[in-house]
Amino acid sequence: MRLRNGKKIEEDVVVIFDVETTGLVPKRKEYRGAKTELQSKSYYYDVPLPDFPYITQLCFVIYDLATDRVLYLYSNYVKLPEGIDISKEASEKTGITREICEEKGVPIVDALIAFYRAVHRASRIIAHNYEFDHTVISIEMKRNMKDARFRRSCPNADRILTSDYLYSRNIRTFCTMRAFTNICKIFYAGKTSGAYKWPRLEEVHHFLFGYKPENLHDAEVDVMTCLKCYLYLFSPPAPPMLG
């Protein structure tokens, strides 16, 4: 048990999260501009803010490792601003359309507030390709700082996922994609030697459990699959008894 801002927190509570978006972040080589304050700590530092994708679906689970149970599951589509479309590739991959976001989605501010509160309950936050997911959420936090309710509910939201902020609150991060790279040992297509590629979530699951899960690229499915792989890494099944 530790204290954070006078409140007790559990060492064993983790948050696993995933987002679906309107598209991919453009390649960095397409940009030559100087870093902005927001982008200075991001892997995607030289991509202009307006070119980042918008979140179409956010899911996270708060999980207690000590009791092996889900404490809270959040999963929602997110409404998009006027004039923002979902790329054909993203829609085909996820099955999410602008109509789905409009009919079933929640305001982005509501989703961000829920995520902000979840992070502050955790001792570790986890994602598959953490760099992408945390960058997209950080961008959305920055975009919505003009909303008064958001600012009141989420102090420092625009830097909540920066390494300095997380370190100051003893919150660690974990990327299953990076963690499993040297475990899965998958070479790039056509290669039989050299560096291993970063494994996709379905590749990690197949490596561990012998089959690929269905309906990936739904944020909720991705989160539960990521959680399953993470738990395997730290608590692998016991070997069968002999004799």
Which ranges hold each PLM region?
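Short loop/turn and capping residues at structural boundaries
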Residues: K27, E102, L216-H217
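A short alpha/beta connector and helix-capping loop motif
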Residues: K27-F60
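Catalytic-core regions of hydrolytic enzymes
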Residues: E102-R121
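N-terminal accessory regions of nucleic-acid-interacting proteins
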Residues: M1-Q39
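Generic detector of short, locally flexible boundary/turn motifs and exposed helical patches
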Residues: D18, T36-Y43, E89-K93, T192-S193
